[in-house]
Amino acid sequence: MELEQLKKSVEENPDDSSLQFELGLYLWDNGGDSEKAAEHFVLSAKSDPNNAVAFKYLGHYYSRVTLDLNRAAKCYQRAVLINPNDSDSGEALCDLFDRQGKEILEIAVCRDASEKSPKAFWAFCRLGYIQLHQKKWSEAVQSLQHAIRGYPTMSDLWEALGLAYQRLGMFTAAIKAYGRAIELDETKIFALVESANIFLMLGSYRKGVELFEQALKISPQNISVLYGLASGLLSWSKECINLGAFGWAASLLEDARKAAKASSELASSMSCIWKLHGDIQLTYARCFPWSGGTENSEFTLKTFSDSILSWRSICYSAALSAKASYQRALHLAPWQANVYTDIAITCDLVSSLSDDSDTSSSWKLPEKMVLGALLLECENSEFWVALGCMSDNSALKLHALIRALHLDVSLAVAWAFMGQIFRESDEMKFAKQAFDCARSIDPTLALPWAGSADTYARESTSDEAFESCLRAAQISPLAEFQVGLAWLALLQGNISSPQIFACIEQAVQRSPYYPEPHNLHGLVCEARHNYHTAIASYRLALAAMSIYPESSVKSHAGKVSINLVRSLSKAGRFKESVMECANLKSKGLLDAGGLQIYAFSLWRTGQNDSALSVIRDLAGRISTREKTSIAFPISFICSLLYCISGLDSAITSIQKMPKDFFQSSKISFIVSAIHSLDQSDRLQSIVASTRSYITSQEEIVAMHYLIALSKLLKTGAGDFLGYEKGIAHLSKAIHMYPHSNLIRNLLGYILLAGEGMKDACTASRCCIINVSECANKEGLKSALEVLGGGSVACNVIGNTAPRFSFPTCHCQYLNAPVVVVELQRFLHQEPSNSSVRYLLILNLVQKAREQRFPRQLCRAIERLISVALSDETCSKEGEYKKFQLLLCASEISLQMGNIAESINHARKASSLSLPSSYLFLGHLQLCRAYAANGSTKNMQEEYRACLELKTDSNIGWICLKLIESQYNLEPDANLLEMSLQECSSQKKNSWKEWMAVYSLARGLDSTGKKDFFSAEEFLAQACSLLNSESCLLLCHGAVCMELARQSNDSQFLSLAVKSLSKVQASSLFPLPIVYTLLAQAHGSLGSKEKWEKNLRLEWFCWPPEMRPAEVYFQMHILARQSEDRPETTSGIENYQSPEKWVIRAIHTDPSCRRYWKVLDKLVQHPMS
């Protein structure tokens, strides 16, 4: 029907171009007569010569039906001329020209269309492809960028643009273009491969390998992908080798080997694939790590030997495989000279791993292979260097390197090997010059740095030697460089550093058959206090000596054995240490140092008589030693005699020693330490004579440290230390040496442990935090630990801007750092430091208490406590820390409402093996938890347990008294009073303070019971003991105000005014609420002026973010008073009207009806 209608319309209007075209299009699309359709297209074009679509379909007719390509081209050209945006006509025309080889016409059509219309995106696209084919990269980029605006989702365009960028060297832009192409079409192999190659070239090996693996999933049999993947994994493994990650490198090389093997099966005639496979196998043989190390618990000589043989076998088979692959590559491409040198290097490695020496010929196989390379490229300087390295003939070696320098005088590697030859010949001057030349040419070459390190070491410039060797080891992690670096670090006393530990770990992996790396690894682990690993390393060193062929190395077995017994002793394995020492003594290998370890181990195993016998043997050897080396043995003898025989025996032995023995600062310290324990001062004269040998400032400071400890011990009474004398001595010493952190930290620590409540604030002023010095020696307290402990004792220390409380302690005015921040910073640097984590937890608990235990902070504390409790320690100090952590966990759980968990933590704390004085606090926490749970029976049991255990903690008794009063437990007031007075009397300097706190607690308890007369008596008693404490005076003033309200007695108002006035006089900064109470008191006494003054002062006591609603309401009262007196306009209350003050009070506390009523009155009856 539609065809009939179209024909009828054409018959009626034969000159209508659109009707002719529609009829022709219908016939074309519906399989009608194409010739008839073409006739109608011709008629349409004649009627409307600008109908581009008609010319397009005529072009289709001539190109597809009649195959008249010339007519088709003319029709398409006409269509494009009329409408340059017609992509179908343009593409069809370009395809015709392309098939005919008319590339110039194709370019002309595209240029003409692109110039006529910027939306002719097909033309830009086609032009970009042609320019890419013609390698006109810059022009192609412009055309493709324009085409992408029209076809932003066409992946081929992005891929072509990426190629153009890549050829221009714009690699970042190329990666982005390829990436967009891959996003649009994940199967774009070319984009994946080329972007991966770019990543490899830029050193991003991981990303390159990931892209190759993605391409491999799409095309598993693609040779380019397999080759690229293998080369990427090889490059990535070399990066890992340079970082010392040999195990990771070996696993990467195993994957690379599989990829290279697969590509060789697909294209076995390509020499580059076999060369790549050889490179992979050679690198694998060089980097495969030995894994039978210190973690092997079942160590025997056989297992060690088997592990070495297994490791050698793996490396040897990889080297043989590399040799075979290189030979196959050489067979396929015998003109490749560099393959000869690869075979030479591989043969040399095979020879070193097999221990076979070819003596049948004067020329070794590696030398012959290098000569083969030189026959092909005799002017290649690198081949001459290779010949110099492979040859054992010194003359030929020197000749080859000189020849290489003749060809290229700036060849750094030739200068480096030349320097090595001179060093081996002991020509150190020439060696130094050669190494300097190599370094100046190429600073990234490792050998010149290592050679310079050897030169500096011979010249006794250890710092330069260490830095040079460190540089060499960083550039190339060879075992020889790393071992040398460890020796230099040992000489400098820096062997425990992380750099040395990493280097020696890597050296052990690559040279397990050599004893020296194992011995150095043991020394490093020992310096890092990892004694069990050190023991295993020393035993591995001894095992390596037993299988090592050179006798010169075996002669050092005695030194390694001494290292072993020392580590056994430090690890607490004294029985094994005694056995090893006895074995060494029977062989005559036990020197003075070994005898000291032997005696110490015997004493620790309870064999005191044998230990004394060894000490006598050691003392007999002292007379034959030089005076400079007798200080340490004598100090050891004195210390061990004190431990075995006691103080009197040690003093007697010291008095019998010749005076020449005391001419050392080390002995002076030991004698002074023993003297500090002697109340009779029998060593006074000897101590005085030895002090003259303490000359350096460091030693003088340390002696002051020891003298202060001596005064603590000697001037104390009973079980209490003499804090006053120790503090006095340190106070003098700190004036002489104000920059000594040792004295500062000790003074702070003693003040912190003292009796005075304000000593914590003084202690915080002594310490200066230096994070680099926080990792102190064992037994010494760091400044961070002192400040951390001080901020636990007094929450204000380090909290320079309290936002949740109004502390009255003067510590708040110290410009101290925020302790929590410093603790977090140091814990971030050393996550394994349990002491810092412990202090951080305690400080965070204090912070949570100040902020009323916010849930987010409580959860963070719970996580920290969980980590800390998982770090089990067996020492008494560790038990006490665990006790504190469990109490903190219990408190946090209690505040978060998890009562059962709180009780569980408190029970665990109460079951620890600690003195009863500490366990008292655990049962006190159980009392609080059961009280919160409503379990009265259990609370009474824990209350009685506290009474039985007792404590020397004043605050413990006070808290128990509060619990007793609040929950009406069975009172035993006499026992509590007596215990508290006894506890306070032992602390002479602070008994008044504690009794005042106790009176405060009783006063608060009476206030809670509405017994204000008793409360006033208790608080007055507290104020008489501490008449300058703001908290006590404030409480007393508030209670007096309540009594005055109840009894209408002006005497209580006077007492309130007196106490509250003292509060502000004793506070450096005004406290809130005090002025309000004073205003009430003065108002009741009839002083309106003082009433107004104090209300105004109350406004300034509050920080803006903490002002309560009542303060705004007070301002409304003053504002109304000011309206009655226009002359008073200078007050803060006049800044706003009374209505606005009330509105601000309502905004702060909208639940107060009183404010709403006042506002209603003000609105209804505004004042004039």
Curated annotation (Swiss-Prot):
Transmembrane segments: none annotated. InterPro entries: Ski3/TTC37 (IPR039226), TPR-like_helical_dom_sf (IPR011990), TPR_2 (IPR013105), TPR_rpt (IPR019734). GO terms for cellular component: cytoplasm; Ski complex. GO terms for molecular function: DNA binding. It is found in: Cytoplasm. Gene3D superfamilies: Tetratricopeptide repeat domain. TPR repeats lie at residues 17-51, 52-86, 121-154, 155-188, 190-222, 301-336, 412-445, 447-479, 515-548, 703-740, 920-953. Component of the cytoplasmic SKI complex, which consists of SKI2, SKI3 and VIP3/SKI8. Component of the SKI complex which is thought to be involved in exosome-mediated RNA decay and associates with transcriptionally active genes in a manner dependent on PAF1 complex (PAF1C). This is Tetratricopeptide repeat protein SKI3. The lineage of its organism: Eukaryota, Viridiplantae, Streptophyta, Embryophyta, Tracheophyta.
